[in-house]
């Protein structure tokens, strides 16, 4: 364009040039073809370019003479980016075509390869780094010659350069090494303490060899002298008492369950060449250590603790627990009685009795018996009492057979146990855990306790209350002879216990008995220090003989005669007079005191007393 000084000439020159340019724009051979690609969706476009495009309708351009059209694109980061499209054409159709071409160029991919790679990583993988990259600012302009120009400015935050990208070099993989084996147990049986632990010559770990294993067994109470023992300790000679068990333990230690003595013997013969072991000539399963360590633990054969059984189930045998004869409580029942069964007392640690135990006779149901132990009781031992009473029916002596189950009572168990058997006698085992010296046993007819019970069925039933009285309470002598009388024909006479060196003691706080009931005013308060047991007889006949137990007093209450007579008359129909006398003598409530810790000398004599003697 030539420079003209006058302004009019300059304007004319510019207008002529514009006309020439319009003619050139009409020729399609001047410009290359523009390819417009349709994007599948607006969501993909937004995520691909990192921009939120606000589509405006074509009505925004109201005047065809406008030279500039502006379109706003709002970014996600609230940054306004203005794309300016400049058109020099005054014709409306040409302006629209130019704007469409500019929009097509705007939608096309950017020419920068680095920008394409970053856009691809951010849009396809939808990583969290999209928020860190600011979308580029694109300016599209059409020059006077009709050639559109695209100018794109890229702004990348500094944090993106420092952030690790997916193209970062991967960390080197770790080499897979050998898995470490778990440490083996020190001993095959319940991991005993092994005092001898030697390393091999190379100093690699604490592997236990067979000769060290045998030394460990010789120092273990669970295996010595049960499986292996010393024969000559000073010379280091030992014997495999149970070669199969030793080989089995060695196989368990080596994790070889099929180990036997032949395989283990080959390893022992290997030690002959090494000078560690030697075979004793002429003796089977006898070996000798050449060098003996000085810090060995020797176990004597006479030590009772050496016979502890191994915890290995393959080597376990029948367990035998030590039983204290003074702490045994025996009970006898008659297996021949109809409807009866043998009673076995089974606490937590009880063991079944052996059949070779001696058999003891049984007293009939109307007799009260206490058997004295031949051994002196221990100072801390307390009473264990089983009371047998059957006032109405007498069991023939021919049917009385005894079976003696044993039990070992643990003082840590609860202080009272009640065992019921299928027939008609109460059983109470009371292992005391307090230093008590006196027990009060009181009988109360069931008819006075349960008013709605049938008198004919409840006349022979009684309720027994066993109360332990501490020795610290004051004592009062009431009666010297203890009498339990039975006048029914065919029944044995009563047993009278006359202690020689024992004074009959009874606490002054014993509740008074009136018509078979306990008066609430004078009844003592039962607490944890004064245990009490209430039981009724519905089982077979049993007799107990705790060591050092003496019955010191039996007292009858005369107030209950009339009431009991009326109850028994309904039951006994064949002999009304005889049944009434039996009820007066047998069903009257009485109080019995059992004391322990006194000299166990008592004379038993048969004596018939009249009711007036009480």
From Swiss-Prot:
Its main location: nucleus. GO terms for biological process: cell differentiation; negative regulation of T cell receptor signaling pathway; regulation of cytokine production; regulation of transcription by RNA polymerase II. It comes from the Eukaryota. Gene3D superfamilies: Winged helix-like DNA-binding domain superfamily/Winged helix DNA-binding domain. GO terms for cellular component: nucleus. Residues 208-290 bind DNA. It is found in: Nucleus. The modification Phosphoserine is found at residues 110, 163, 167-168, 187, 430. Keywords: Activator, DNA-binding, Nucleus, Phosphoprotein, Transcription, Transcription regulation. Disulfide bonds: none annotated. The keyword Transport does not apply. Residues 310-335 have a biased composition (Low complexity). GO terms for molecular function: DNA-binding transcription activator activity, RNA polymerase II-specific; DNA-binding transcription factor activity, RNA polymerase II-specific; RNA polymerase II cis-regulatory region sequence-specific DNA binding. Residues 159-199, 303-371 are annotated as: Disordered. The modification Phosphothreonine is found at residue 190. Residues 173-182 have a biased composition (Basic residues). Belongs to the ETS family. Binds to the underphosphorylated form of RB. May interact with other transcription factors in order to regulate specific genes. Interacts with RUNX1. Transcription factor that activates the LYN and BLK promoters. This is ETS-related transcription factor Elf-1. It comes from Bos taurus. The gene is ELF1.
